[in-house]
Each structure stands twice: as C-alpha cells, then as structure tokens.
C-alpha cells in the first residue's frame, strides 16, 4: 500500500512539473483506482467490526450498520 501511494505521489509531482506520457497517465489512473478500492475495503472492514456505545453503555450503533454486521456474520 505504501508503494502504491509513493508511486501515485511521484506521478502527481511529475505531472505538475513536466506532464505525463500516455502510459504514465494510465498507470496513475490504475494506481488511484487500486488505492481507492483497497482503502474502501479497509474502511468497510473497520466499520463492520465497530460497535457504538453511548455514555450510559447503551448500544447506539445505527440500524443499517447492525444489519450489515448481521449479514456479514450470516455469510461466513
């Protein structure tokens, strides 16, 4: 993941400085898409394993999140 982000930043700097070739532009788009998909997958994983509790210790996790968590457990 760090390598992908490093390369994205490297291409971005080059784009601002001198521009990118067609191949580099395609690589940049592919890397950005890959990074975004990976990031979203990680975020989904974190959220699906999250429980929200108020000051009184009551579960206040939104219903939509609870439903998604139940579906995930049933699919395993």
From Swiss-Prot:
Domain of life: Bacteria
An example Gene Ontology CC term for this record: cytoplasm
Annotated Gene3D superfamilies: Helix hairpin bin
UniProt keywords, alphabetically: Cytoplasm
Compartmental location: Cytoplasm
Pfam families, sorted: DUF896
Cytoplasm as UniProt keyword: yes
InterPro entries reported in the protein's UniProt record: DUF896
Chief location category: cytoplasm
Family indicated by similarity: Belongs to the UPF0291 family.
Listed PANTHER family: UPF0291 PROTEIN BC_1827, UPF0291 PROTEIN CBO2609/CLC_2481
NCBIfam families noted in UniProt: PRK01631.1
The protein's name: UPF0291 protein BC_1827
Originating species: Bacillus cereus (strain ATCC 14579 / DSM 31 / CCUG 7414 / JCM 2152 / NBRC 15305 / NCIMB 9373 / NCTC 2599 / NRRL B-3711)
């Amino acid at each position: 993941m760090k390598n992908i982000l490093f390369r994205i930043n490297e291409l971005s700097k080059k784009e601002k400085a001198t521009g990118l070739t067609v191949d580099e532009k395609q690589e940049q788009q592919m890397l950005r898409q890959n990074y975004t998909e990976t990031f979203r997958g990680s975020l989904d994983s974190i959220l699906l394993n999250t429980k929200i509790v108020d000051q009184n210790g009551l579960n206040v996790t939104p219903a939509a999140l609870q439903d998604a968590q139940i579906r995930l457990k049933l699919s395993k």
